[in-house]
């Protein structure tokens, strides 16, 4: 027996590409996507235009959830005294509008992202379930973990910045989608740019995990910081930062805790 998907494939096979694209345009127009991305005539309950900028304000994140490298923010401009909201954000459709036009205005299909991840890397690559990458609304950020493989403690202390290789590992149960995210968004490749940050973190771990530093702190600075845990947060401010609002926080936290778990040299 033919499945609904098989029947749909047979149906669309008879439709020319030009007609399919015209159909997509009409569906997007009916659903109001052009207004959403431009000057929206649809209003929210409090009277604001329902637009990409409003959606971004409601989501309330400042960093791209796909890469955690780029800020995505909204701002206001006032030409001729009229306040207008703008945004640096792309509205990435998890399932692309070109293939799933009926999902163009479904907020569960709209993911705020940076232009690099959406317009240069993702594009229309997710066309079916087997292509699916991690879904930010359901998959936690821990679905992908940054690591820097090394064999022993002396190697950790000895490696140079050029030796650093940043890799990502998918967590159990989401390995396939995690691998797709790595592939689509080129995460391991683009994060090679940040080897200097990992190298600096490694040096801080090496320098401040020594017993003599712990002793000096306990004897002289406990009152200043209110405790050793607070001292660690001052030394590594990313530990107290929210990765939804600060770029590169996920990489820093993952590497820090990876070293803490795999190497008995941390504080």
Q: How would you describe each model-predicted region?
A:
Residues 1-44:
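N-terminal accessory alpha/beta regions
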Residues 160-267:
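C-terminal, charged low-complexity interaction regions
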Residues 23-27, 50-60, 101-107:
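Short, flexible, mixed-charge glycine/proline-rich loop motifs
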Residues 120-183:
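Domain-level detector of nuclease and nuclease-like folds
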Residues 30-52, 92-99:
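Short Cys/His-rich Zn2+-coordinating modules
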